[in-house]
Amino acid sequence: MKRVLLLLSFVFAALSTQAADYNILKYGAISDTTRLSTKAVQRAIDACAAAGGGRVVVPTGNYKIGSIFLKSNVHLYLERGATLYGSTKLEDYKPVKTDYVSFRTQQQTIQLIFADKVSNVTIDGYGTIDGRGRAFKKTAVTDEGITRPHLLRFIQSQDIIIRNITLRNSGCWMQHFLACDRIKIDGVTVYNRSTKNNDALDLDGCHDVVVTNLISDSDDDGITLKSTSPRLCENITISNCIVSTHCNAIKLGTETNGGFRNINISNIVVKPSYDQDETIFGRKSGISAISLEMVDGGVLENVNVNNIVVDGTESPIFIRLGNRARGYKEGLAVTNVGKIDGVRISNVRVRNAGPTGCSITGLPGYPVENIHLDNISIHHKGGVTAEAMPKIEESAADEREKSYPEATMWGVLPAKGFFVRHARNVKFTNIEIQTEQEDVRDNFVMIDVKE
């Protein structure tokens, strides 16, 4: 009898320590997209955090919110059939100014779901978060989204899980993780084609990240690694994803103040969007599948890309060392040219590409180094004639050191395969280039390339 009572006491103790659920309906949320439930959802989050953590449950229904703020040990769970809709009014979003210094934190920013200096946070379930981003338009050429709401934004946070949910229609970037550690993103579906700067995923100066089973369709870049502060993106693996984009499917850049180290990317399908009714930015078939850029003085090293299948894109592979030299805060000059050293790209199959070609380029005195490409098959439109070559070569002769890096920055390239300039120890193995139409260009054009 004593043993039974002792066992029961252990069971009750275990049950009492289980994290509780905090249903947003109990805190006043209403399934009605005409009425705000921001305060109710925030009350549930605050109560959960005050109790030491637990699960904030969004039940089946449609809920309208402005900015909400996640806290440590909170698990935001969206039931199947549950949707959190972002308000279409800017006044429903609370501007915040983090103390973390980066290019994108110099001003106040707004976001639908925000977290700064939190740990052990999960967002999952089988529901949807929809930012209704079409309500927020780009107001100026210099507007990079600071005045429009991000959907998810985490800064200086650790142990984050984003799993199984659907994310739609952000006013800016869909997911921005800045200076965060230990992130897992698994089974997330993204549709982000509402307005300008509609990236699918931005990892910015993050460490120890696993991204897997992501399916994304974005008007702007797909899976993007950035470095808008001196903190590198480091120790990141991305695998088993399907990416559709009008811009760059897998991109390291554009901001590269710190750089990228120990990046492994594998088993990626790049394909056109199912929905081609509108292109806000970029091209319907996409600009590039693999874009590795270093233009703001950082370092890019030990990057491995393997087993990529591409349907479309204008210029499948783009590796660029430039010197835009933009600092990560106002008044800070970048005085050094960056470095690209140690890239392997293997087992890439490309079909239906544009005629531009691929490029691997450094700058005079600053070569890209140790670039190995093997087992690459590219089939594209071709069609370049001898009459077109003088203009093509004239465009490519311009180094464009300070220009924004883009795979199409020179237009059609002098090579139908790879245009390589200012490079050391670049190795090609088993490269196949085929064109639909006759094309007079050589497969490879190399300028200032040495062992």
Predicted regions and their residues:
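Extracellular/periplasmic carbohydrate-active domains that bind, remodel
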Residues: 8, 18-451
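Sec-dependent N-terminal signal peptides
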Residues: 4-13
